[in-house]
Each structure stands twice: as C-alpha cells, then as structure tokens.
UniProtKB/Swiss-Prot annotation:
An annotated GO cellular component: cytoplasm
Record-linked InterPro entries: Bet_v_I/MLP, Bet_v_I_allergen, Plant_def-hormone_signal, START-like_dom_sf
GO biological process, one term: defense response
Family note: Belongs to the BetVI family.
Organism, scientific name: Betula pendula
Pfam family, any one: Bet_v_1
Residues given in the record as brassinolide binding sites: 55, 82, 84, 101
Compartments reported by the entry: Cytoplasm
Keywords: Allergen, Cytoplasm, Pathogenesis-related protein, Plant defense
Matches recorded under PANTHER family: OS08G0374000 PROTEIN-RELATED, STRESS-INDUCED PROTEIN SAM22
Designated name of the protein: Major pollen allergen Bet v 1-E
Length: 160
C-alpha cells in the first residue's frame, strides 16, 4: 500500500466561522440544494454526525460514480477543522483502499477565509493515483465551495 498526498487551498470571501457552519456542519443539507448538478443527496447511514458517522453521498447522472460512502473522522468546532474518509464507492475499489480528507478553514485579515485541503489517497499494491482523479476531486470541491459561497452571499442572514 502506498499513500499519495495532495494539498491545495481555496479562498473565500465568507468569514471562517460562517463558512464552517454552512460548508461543513450543514453541507449534507446544503450541497444538494445549491449544487444539485454535483450532489443529489446525502444520507446518514449510521451515527449522529460526529466521528464514526457513516454517510452515503449520491451523485446525479453525468457524474462518473453513483455514490460514495464516507466516514467522519474528526469535527473540530474550535479550529474549524473537519476530517473524513471515503471508504466505499466512487474511486475506492480495485486500486484505492480509501481517501482521507482534511479540511481546515482559516480566517484571513480581510474577513474572508482560506480552505486548506489535504487529501491522502491510500492505494492498493503498487497502484498510482491518476491525475484525472485529483483533478475531478478538486473540481468537485471548487464547485461545492462556490455554490455555498453564492448561497451565503445571497442569504446574508443564513448561518450567522
């Protein structure tokens, strides 16, 4: 098994605390509403949303995968940090054991925030992660972020 680490950052004009509430804590409800072209539904399979919770994320037609199952690994309300692992479905299978993801939302001096994202692809055997997988994951994250950001800008009273 190998581990391929990929780090990226994305900026937002939304303050860190507000973005954490919307994007992380209520993303299960918000994503299908604001980005139905990316996520059709999120279903809680097991748990209460904290560490150990298993969620099934279903994708609409046009996305190469029908679903993924993810496990919440950490929710840090103080430091705006969220960790989860994709453990089934999607790209996980013959070549990938799991994908561990960590998102940390950091406040910026101008009142916005930076999302620091660390993805660890745990491969099976000597398989390598394809550049297309990383690109697709980054594009999905960017789509969700911009959709949530647009929603929050249009609804100034939401998630305060």
């Amino acid at each position: 098994m190998g581990v391929f680490n990929y780090e990226t950052e994305a900026t937002s004009v939304i303050p860190a605390a507000r973005l954490f509430k919307a994007f992380i804590l209520d993303g299960d409800n918000l994503f299908p509403k604001v980005a139905p072209q990316a996520i059709s539904s999120v279903e809680n399979i097991e748990g209460n949303g904290g560490p150990g919770t298993i969620k099934k994320i279903s994708f609409p037609e046009g996305i190469p995968f029908k679903y993924v199952k993810g496990r919440v690994d950490e929710v840090d309300h103080t430091n705006f940090k969220y960790s989860y692992s994709v453990i089934e479905g999607g790209p996980v299978g013959d070549t990938l054991e799991k994908i561990s993801n960590e998102i940390k939302i950091v406040a910026t001096p101008n009142g916005g925030s930076i999302l620091k994202i660390n993805n660890k692809y745990h491969t099976k055997g000597d398989h390598e992660v394809k550049a297309e997988q990383i690109k697709a994951s980054k594009e999905m994250g960017e789509t969700l972020l911009r959709a949530v950001e647009s929603y929050l800008l249009a609804h100034s009273d939401a998630y305060n």
